[in-house]
């Protein structure tokens, strides 16, 4: 299949996708909003006054939902390499999470406060090389877990998108070392063909 044909196929599937249509109808920033809503409905992670950090936040599908749960007295920091239009109550950092400069900016905003929940929908820019792309994905996941391990409150929680493949089982073992409860969850709003699932980790051991 030519690149042009595959692009047309993706566009057709995207524009006819139920969750894309619903997101547009409801004014959500992306279909990803439904994933975090499903996670919240099932696991009740977000509560008023919580401090949450959203990694890989753009275009804001997760942040716009989470801020509703944590309320005006909660704190939400969102970070992404791409631009994100402002969301009331959300502090945004644009930068590469893997860079020291961006990591320092995030730490400055965190200001030694303990975080209640770290959520990550990060994914690398795909090159088409599955082995390389998977390795980059695992690297970002490890960075997110390291950040959570350093900054979470005891009994805090961690949510991250994982692509099933080389290194994913080993990654789950690392998560289990830090949390008492670790669950693999594939939302209904995840595309059926996608290898993605979400790790829901609660009761951080501290």
From Swiss-Prot:
- Residues recorded as binding S-adenosyl-L-methionine, renumbered to this chain, are 60, 62, 80, 96, 121
An example GO CC term for this entry is: cytoplasm
**Highest taxon, organism lineage:** Bacteria
Active site residues of this protein: 161
Q: Which Pfam families does the record cross-reference, listed alphabetically?
A: FtsJ
Could you say which EC number(s) this protein's record lists? 2.1.1.166
Please list the reactions this protein catalyses. Answer: uridine(2552) in 23S rRNA + S-adenosyl-L-methionine = 2'-O-methyluridine(2552) in 23S rRNA + S-adenosyl-L-homocysteine + H(+)
Q: Which family does it belong to?
A: Belongs to the class I-like SAM-binding methyltransferase superfamily. RNA methyltransferase RlmE family.
Classification via PANTHER family: RIBOSOMAL RNA METHYLTRANSFERASE, RRNA METHYLTRANSFERASE 2, MITOCHONDRIAL
State the protein's purpose: Specifically methylates the uridine in position 2552 of 23S rRNA at the 2'-O position of the ribose in the fully assembled 50S ribosomal subunit.
Q: What is this protein called?
A: Ribosomal RNA large subunit methyltransferase E
Q: Lineage, please?
A: Bacteria, Pseudomonadati, Pseudomonadota, Gammaproteobacteria, Thiotrichales
């Amino acid at each position: 299949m030519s690149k042009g044909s595959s692009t047309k196929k993706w566009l057709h599937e995207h524009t006819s996708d139920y969750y894309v249509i619903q997101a547009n109808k409801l004014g959500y920033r992306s279909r990803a909003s439904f994933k975090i809503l499903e996670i919240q409905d099932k696991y009740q992670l977000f509560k008023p006054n919580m401090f949450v950090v959203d990694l890989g936040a753009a275009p804001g599908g997760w942040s716009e939902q989470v801020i509703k749960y944590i309320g005006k007295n909660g704190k939400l920091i969102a970070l992404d390499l791409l631009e994100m239009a402002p969301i009331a109550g959300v502090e945004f950092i644009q930068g590469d999470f893997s860079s020291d400069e961006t990591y320092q900016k995030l730490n400055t905003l965190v200001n030694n406060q303990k975080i209640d929940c770290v959520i990550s929908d990060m994914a690398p820019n795909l090159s088409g090389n599955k082995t390389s792309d998977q390795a980059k994905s695992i690297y970002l996941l490890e960075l997110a877990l390291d950040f959570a391990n350093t900054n979470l409150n005891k009994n805090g929680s961690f949510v991250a998108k994982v692509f099933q493949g080389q290194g994913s089982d080993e990654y789950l073992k690392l998560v289990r070392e830090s949390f008492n409860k670790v669950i693999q969850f594939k939302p209904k709003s995840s595309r059926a063909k996608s290898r993605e699932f979400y790790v829901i980790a609660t009761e951080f051991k501290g």
